[in-house]
Each structure stands twice: as C-alpha cells, then as structure tokens.
C-alpha cells in the first residue's frame, strides 16, 4: 500500500501533524497500536505488588514547531483558565498545580496501600519533599521530573495542560484527554487502530513500514511515538531520526548539580539559556539542578568543560534574575550523563571517595541493582 504521508502514533504529536495535513487536504494515514480510547499522550507502566500503575508523560521523539499552543487552543475552541497568582506557576502533574498534584499523589499512595516498602532500594527526596509533598518516593519523583521536563521542552508544540501567555499561566479546563480526542475527530477514519509497527526501513522512494497487518510504502514518514515504544523498533538507523531517539537512548543529556555558597531567592522554574536548551530546577535555595539537553548540539556539548557549562548557566541566571553570581560562588558541582534510570547521587558519592557531599545535597537514591555506595557510573564530583 502506497501512502504520501504516514504517521506512526496517534498521540498529541501525531494527531497534531495529521490535523495540519488534513487542513491542507493532504492524503495521510495514522498507525496507532492502541484502541480508539487511547486517551493520553502516553503512559509508562510499572508494577507494584502485582498491581500495574500508569504514569502519564508525553511523546518525546518529535513535535511540530509550526504553530503555538495558543493558536491551537483557539482553533479547537478549548477553554483556558488563568492560574491564580497565589498558586505555583509550574505544573508538574498534567493540568494541576502543586496543591492539586499533592492531592493526586496522596490518592496514589493510598491506592498503593500507603507503603514506602512498595519501592525497595529507593529513598525519599527530602529537600524537595519538604517544600512540595509530604513524602516523595523515587517513582513519583521520576514521574514529576519527566512530566516537568517534557512540558518545558522548548522544541515542542507545547502539548502541556498549562501554558504561559504574556506572563500569565493558563491551563486547559477540559484537560489534555479532551484536547486529544477533539483534534482527531475530523480524521478518525484515517487512523488505523490496533496496529503495531514491527520495522521501518529506508527505501529509494521513501520508507517501508511493516506492521502486524500490512506493509506500507510512504513518501514521508512521521515518527510520533514515545521513547519506550521507539526502543522496540530499529528507528535508530533512519537519518534525522536518531538524534531525537538519542536524547533518551544515549548520553546526550548532561545533568549538573551546582552547590552554591549563597542563597538564591528564586522560584522553581524552567530556564532557557542562550547557548542551548537548559532545564533548571531549584532543589534548595543553595542547590540547583541544570539539565543540558540538545541532541543537535550533543557533540559540542561533550567537548565543553563542565566549568564552561556552569559559567554559561551563571550568566543566564544573572541576566534573567538580575543576580551577581560568579564562579567563585560555586562550592561543589556534580555532573553525570542522563544514562541509567534517573538516579543521581547517594549520600557518599562512591566507595573510596574521600570527598563528602554537603549535608543539604541529598537528591535521590540509586537505581535498583546498584550498591548503596555507588553513584552514577559516569558521574564525577569536583571540589572547587
């Protein structure tokens, strides 16, 4: 079967691309492995006490850059509600403020018998937990961090439930599930559900896509799946696709924890730097996490010294928040590639290391299978 435009994945990214093609009268087909009630952007499933728990995230591979979320909301006639000024301005749980997320988290813990023993080998993120949640176990921390990271991706269509418009944060009253269903209503007949992609190959005419039902030849291919689905298919061989997958499958995300000797009175938030896309999170008022993520600039990033990256971050902080930080204000910095799970540090960096972390730098625990005195395999601790 020959198709002009073939889209893999009917989540918000795939549906948005289909929406644009449909408006232009282009012929296309969308392949979706789930049923018509696919619902959310995508979910990660993990099991606790033989019970499967779904965690909602968003498509990580490819997003449209042609239209802003506000234009799309207007086009779909979706309602937005301003965020009250006394609320936190960052949404880490889709469509909810910190307080609402806290309620959802409590409900989740109750569903899981409110037992931390459900998460063996994981500890709480104490500093962050005291300011946001009563307790914050590793799995939920990973959930929040993933969601927050995805929702502040500078390259995305901004498929989040909250969006900033002229300094004011808005959220979609109907929720993302409603948005996803509404955007695909005009072309439901062009979405082939219950279809699993088995392989993708480059051909002289375009791409050959094999599914569990048929074989398709496409002139143009749009891969709009999450990273976990992408791992099951050999997309990595495709030109201009590997860089997106590498963002989650290789060492192109560098995370740096910066410990300062002074307090910074700045709220939590996402910071986009001049040099490359950076996601900054305040762990405490003296401890900051900076994630450098840009597959395109990966080679340049790897060739830069950590100190140079930190200086770039300091410049951005000073410019954005009118601060007077210098490199001399940095006491420690810890770096590592976003490589294995989402663990970062243990209380003692690794066995035999004589340099101790400051007491207020207890970020998270270790991934399963790692020793208690082991941190990131490729992490390094530097003392200035």
What do these predicted regions represent?
Residues 202, 214-267:
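Central helical "cap/lid" subdomain
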Residues 113-199, 203-206, 224-234:
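Active-site/ligand-binding neighborhood in enzyme catalytic cores
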Residues 38, 73, 129, 183, ...:
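Generic structural signal for small/hydrophobic residues in well-ordered secondary structure
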Residues 243, 251-300:
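Active-site substrate-recognition segment that forms the wall
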Residues 22-48:
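Glycine-rich FAD pyrophosphate-binding loop
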Residues 2-30:
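N-terminal Rossmann-like FAD-binding beta1-loop-alpha1 element of flavoenzymes
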Residues 16, 206, 279-384:
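Conserved flavin/dinucleotide-binding core of flavoenzymes
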Residues 50-119:
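Dinucleotide-binding Rossmann-like beta1-alpha1 core, especially the glycine-rich loop
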């Amino acid at each position: 079967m020959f198709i002009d435009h073939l889209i893999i994945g009917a989540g918000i990214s795939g549906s948005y691309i289909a929406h644009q093609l449909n408006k232009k009268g282009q012929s296309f087909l969308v392949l979706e492995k789930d049923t018509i009630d696919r619902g959310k952007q995508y979910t990660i499933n993990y099991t606790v006490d033989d019970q499967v728990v779904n965690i909602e995230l968003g498509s990580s591979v490819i997003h449209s850059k042609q239209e802003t979320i506000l234009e799309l909301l207007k086009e779909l006639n979706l309602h937005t509600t301003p965020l009250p000024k006394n609320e936190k301005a960052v949404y880490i749980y889709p469509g909810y403020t910190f307080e609402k997320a806290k309620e959802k988290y409590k409900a989740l813990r109750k569903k899981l018998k409110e037992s931390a023993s459900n998460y063996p080998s994981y500890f709480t993120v104490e500093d962050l937990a005291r300011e946001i949640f009563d307790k914050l176990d590793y799995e939920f921390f990973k959930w929040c961090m993933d969601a927050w990271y995805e929702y502040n991706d500078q390259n995305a269509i901004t498929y989040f439930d909250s969006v900033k418009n002229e300094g004011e944060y808005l959220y979609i009253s109907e929720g993302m599930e409603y948005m996803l269903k509404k955007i695909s209503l005009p072309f439901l007949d062009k979405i082939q559900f219950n279809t699993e992609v088995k392989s993708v190959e480059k051909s002289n005419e375009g791409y050959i896509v094999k599914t569990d039902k048929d074989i398709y030849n496409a002139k143009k291919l749009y891969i709009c799946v999450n990273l976990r689905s992408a791992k099951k298919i050999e997309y990595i061989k495709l030109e201009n696709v590997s860089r997106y997958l590498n963002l989650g499958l290789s060492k192109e995300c560098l995370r740096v924890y910066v410990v300062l000797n002074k307090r910074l009175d700045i709220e939590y938030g996402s910071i986009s730097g001049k040099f490359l896309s950076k996601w900054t999170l305040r762990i405490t008022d003296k401890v900051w996490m900076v994630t450098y993520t840009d597959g395109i600039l990966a080679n340049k990033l790897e060739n830069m010294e950590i100190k140079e990256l930190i200086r770039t971050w300091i410049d951005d902080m000073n410019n954005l928040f009118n601060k007077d930080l210098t490199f001399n204000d940095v006491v420690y910095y810890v770096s590592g590639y976003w490589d294995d799970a989402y663990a970062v540090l243990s209380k003692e960096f690794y066995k035999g290391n004589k340099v101790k972390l400051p007491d207020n730098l207890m970020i998270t625990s270790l991934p399963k299978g790692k020793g208690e005195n082991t941190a990131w395999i490729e992490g390094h601790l530097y003392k200035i």
